[in-house]
Each structure stands twice: as C-alpha cells, then as structure tokens.
C-alpha cells in the first residue's frame, strides 16, 4: 500500500517523474534508446532502470555523459519483490525498446500496475502489449520521446484498454501464447 510506495521512493531516491524499464541491462534490451530519448523530453522527466548490470553498462554510461543527463538516469538493482510493484506504480510510463525479446512479461506487469507502455516494433512485444500500447522503431530516439508524450496525454484510456487486453494472460496459459508467437516469426 501507501507505505510501500513511500518506502520505495525513499530507499531508492526515486525522482518525482520517471519512465521505467525493468530487465537485465544488456545490449538487446536497447536501453540506450531510452537514454537518447530523454533530451527530447521535459527536463524533469527521469529514467529509472531496474535490473542486473552487464558490460553494456559502460556504453550506457558514456552516452549518459556525452548527453549531459547524468542526474536524470538511475540504475537500481537487487530490489526485493515486495517493493517492485511500488516502483512500477509510481512511474509515468513504461518503456521497453528491446530489439529481440521473448514475450515481454514486464510489459504485462507494467499494464497490470496501471502504466501506459511504449515498446519496440516488430517482435513478440506487440503480442504482450496489445493494440493500445505504442510501438516505435528500435533506433528512433525522438520517436520514442514522442510516443511517451502521447502515452502521457492518453494515459487513462490507454491503461484501461490495455488492462482489458492483458486479462487474457491471467486465465490462459501464457506459455502457449508465447510459443504461438515464436512460431510465426
């Protein structure tokens, strides 16, 4: 409840407004795109990335430095499961610009937490996010920023429709759906 929200905000020094990404920080997750999109967004919008770091972190750090947005990007790892929902719930939107991903389980979690989702086109992510999430080219930072702006304007409607859509994963075997998605690729 409210306690978890406050605890998460304090413990992880969460910014007032942030976009969220959850997953291992590795090349194919393409978090670089989220970093490159930040300069196109309002100054008070931050990016919070939750996940285990890999060597890809070096590349991200140099991009953050050259864009001069070090104070706007926050990497957090080792979050206990009981606080993760609080981090989802306080975000403005969920971004998932991954190039090759499985089914995008974090997308479903984000929608269930009441977040609008912006993901990359052309993988199984569209299957997870449904028709009311927004999808952008995996190399288009400005496009990602524009989609985030749009998601925030249409937030209530996007979230309501997407929540309806992801209900199908609650009562069906998600594994079956993932397999059927892969078979089409």
Regions found by a protein language model. Give the residues of each.
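Aromatic "clamp/platform" in nucleotide-sugar-dependent glycosyltransferases that forms part
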Residues: 99
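Nucleotide-activated donor-binding/catalytic signature segment of Leloir-type glycosyltransferases, i.e.
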Residues: 60-82
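Short alpha-helical donor nucleotide-sugar binding micro-motif in glycosyltransferases
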Residues: 86-91, 96
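A short, well-ordered alpha-helix in the C-terminal region of glycosyltransferases
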Residues: 156-169, 179
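Conserved acidic donor-binding segment of nucleotide-sugar-dependent glycosyltransferases
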Residues: 134-141, 150-155
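C-terminal alpha-helical cap of glycosyltransferases
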Residues: 171-185
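A conserved mid-protein helix/loop that constitutes part of the nucleotide-sugar donor-binding site
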Residues: 24-40, 58-61
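Short hydrophobic beta-strand element within catalytic cores of glycosyltransferases
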Residues: 107, 111-112, 116-119
């Amino acid at each position: 409840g409210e306690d978890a929200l406050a605890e998460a905000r304090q413990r992880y020094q969460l910014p007032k407004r942030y976009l969220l990404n959850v997953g291992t920080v590795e090349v194919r997750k393409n978090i670089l795109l989220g970093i490159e999109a930040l300069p196109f967004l309002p100054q008070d919008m931050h990016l919070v990335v939750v996940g285990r770091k890999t060597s890809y972190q070096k590349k991200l750090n140099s991009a953050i430095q050259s864009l001069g947005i070090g104070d706007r990007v926050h990497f957090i790892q080792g979050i206990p499961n009981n606080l993760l929902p609080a981090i989802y719930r306080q975000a403005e939107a969920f971004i998932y610009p991954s190039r090759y991903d499985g089914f995008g389980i974090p997308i479903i979690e984000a929608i269930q937490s009441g977040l609008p989702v912006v993901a990359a086109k052309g993988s199984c992510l569209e299957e997870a996010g449904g028709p009311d999430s927004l999808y952008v080219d995996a190399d288009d930072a400005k496009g990602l920023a524009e989609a985030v702006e749009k998601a925030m304007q249409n937030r209530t409607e996007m979230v309501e429709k997407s929540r309806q859509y992801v209900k199908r994963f609650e009562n069906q075997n998600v594994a079956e759906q993932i397999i059927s998605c892969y078979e089409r690729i």
